[in-house]
């Protein structure tokens, strides 16, 4: 499918640089194919769903995955570099996107330290060896530390990995450490936030409980590949980077019971949706899942496990806009995004939200 079909004009001013405050004050656009668009608020979500429905949250926790350091090579001078960790392959190995990747080669040693430091003492530094250099700036790093010791070093020396469209406009600050983390995050490992979840405050979660809506947690450690642009002209030529997900047997049983009684499984974010679809059989039965998924969803995909989706507003030509177009229909989403832009909705990670229903979904009294 041609990538330019997913292009649209997005004013730069529409990209939010800060989230709404409080976090549940964001706007919510309800999109049901065939029905008028409805301008609501995130706080309306409990009233827009039915008792017995299940909201599925991704409980991954963002780690400070952006590391700055100095490359050292025998007979050469030091070279500043940056690595954005995106996939852990072993207790001491991470795949990362490096800058400048062309200046790195297998065998190079890198001393990572505090942001912008040119000299780092042995006690505060983190050493790694470049084992591979791949395409698109990707490298494989083998660290001298392993397991929890490596986790502790990354937590102490790394910086929060804000998305490029935000980080390019302003520096990361202390407020981002709270803003760019869901209130229910508990499983460290993501290098990008599951941003649809950023809208949920403790008060909103309490309202969801009071409305009789189930809350279910799964884990997908979001990788930096979510920030990568689609450079191919056709979706068939684009390769998704793998991400690690976990959905246990008890969770699978709960979700299957929700659908068996006629209620809906509502994914909070594209990351939760991708994990659910990766775990589902062709008949929609959700199975336990533990491992990597590189599922790439474009129009024509038949959804198996998800009945509605809460998600932010995504960038043009992105894999995420392709996914929502597959879910609700390309024409529907192009019209919804045109309305959102004209109505001043805020886009991207810190922006507003939408509640999407799939093509062919029956009209619900709670939405009309």
From Swiss-Prot:
- Extract one GO BP annotation from the record: tRNA wobble guanine modification
Give the source species: Methylorubrum extorquens (strain PA1) (Methylobacterium extorquens)
Name of the protein in its database record: S-adenosylmethionine:tRNA ribosyltransferase-isomerase
Q: Gene encoding this chain?
A: queA
What disulfide bonds does the UniProt entry report for this chain? none
The family line of this record is: Belongs to the QueA family.
Entry GO terms, CC: cytoplasm
Q: What's the domain of life for this entry? A: Bacteria
EC annotation? 2.4.99.17
Instruction: Spell out the SUPFAM superfamilies in the cross-references.
Output: QueA-like (SSF111337)
Catalysed conversion reaction: 7-aminomethyl-7-carbaguanosine(34) in tRNA + S-adenosyl-L-methionine = epoxyqueuosine(34) in tRNA + adenine + L-methionine + 2 H(+)
What does the record give under GO molecular function?
S-adenosylmethionine:tRNA ribosyltransferase-isomerase activity
Q: What Pfam families is this protein classified in?
A: Queuosine_synth (PF02547)
- Top EC category: transferase
Key words, A-Z: Cytoplasm, Queuosine biosynthesis, S-adenosyl-L-methionine, Transferase
Q: Does the keyword Electron transport apply?
A: no
Q: What is its main location?
A: cytoplasm
Q: What does this protein do?
A: Transfers and isomerizes the ribose moiety from AdoMet to the 7-aminomethyl group of 7-deazaguanine (preQ1-tRNA) to give epoxyqueuosine (oQ-tRNA).
Its quaternary organisation is:
Monomer.
- Pathway noted in the entry: tRNA modification; tRNA-queuosine biosynthesis
UniProt-annotated location(s): Cytoplasm
């Amino acid at each position: 499918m041609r990538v330019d079909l997913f292009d649209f004009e997005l004013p730069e001013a529409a990209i939010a640089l800060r989230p709404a405050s409080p976090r549940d004050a964001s706007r919510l656009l309800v999109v049901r194919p065939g029905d008028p668009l409805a301008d609501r608020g995130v706080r309306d979500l409990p009233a827009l769903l039915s008792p017995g429905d299940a909201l599925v949250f991704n409980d991954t926790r963002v780690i400070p995955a952006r590391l700055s350091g100095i490359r050292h090579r025998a007979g050469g001078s030091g070279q500043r570099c940056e690595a954005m960790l995106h996939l852990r392959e072993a207790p001491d190995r991470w795949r990362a996107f490096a800058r400048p990747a062309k200046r790195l080669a297998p065998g190079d040693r890198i001393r990572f330290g505090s942001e912008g430091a040119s000299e780092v003492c042995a006690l505060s530094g983190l050493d790694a060896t470049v084992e591979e250099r791949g395409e698109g700036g990707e490298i494989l790093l083998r660290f001298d530390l392993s397991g929890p010791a490596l986790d502790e070093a990354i937590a102490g020396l790394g910086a929060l990995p804000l998305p490029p469209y935000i980080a390019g406009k302003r520096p990361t600050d202390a407020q981002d450490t709270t803003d760019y983390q869901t209130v229910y995050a508990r499983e460290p490992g993501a290098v990008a936030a599951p941003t649809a979840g950023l809208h949920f405050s403790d008060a909103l979660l309490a309202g969801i409980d009071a409305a009789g809506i189930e809350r279910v947690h799964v884990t997908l450690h979001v990788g930096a590949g979510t920030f990568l642009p689609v450079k191919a002209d056709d979706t068939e030529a684009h390769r998704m980077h793998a991400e690690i997900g976990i959905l246990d047997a008890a969770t699978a049983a709960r979700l299957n019971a929700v659908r068996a009684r006629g209620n809906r499984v509502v994914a909070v974010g594209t990351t939760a949706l991708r994990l659910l679809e990766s775990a589902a059989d062709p008949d929609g039965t959700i199975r336990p899942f533990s491992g990597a998924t590189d599922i790439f969803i474009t129009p024509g995909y038949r959804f198996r496990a998800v009945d509605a989706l809460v998600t932010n507003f995504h960038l043009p030509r992105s894999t995420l806009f392709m996914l929502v177009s597959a879910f609700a229909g390309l024409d529907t989403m192009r019209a919804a995004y045109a309305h959102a832009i004209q109505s001043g909705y805020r886009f991207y990670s810190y922006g507003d939200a939408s509640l999407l229903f799939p093509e062919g979904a029956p009209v619900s009294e709670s939405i009309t």
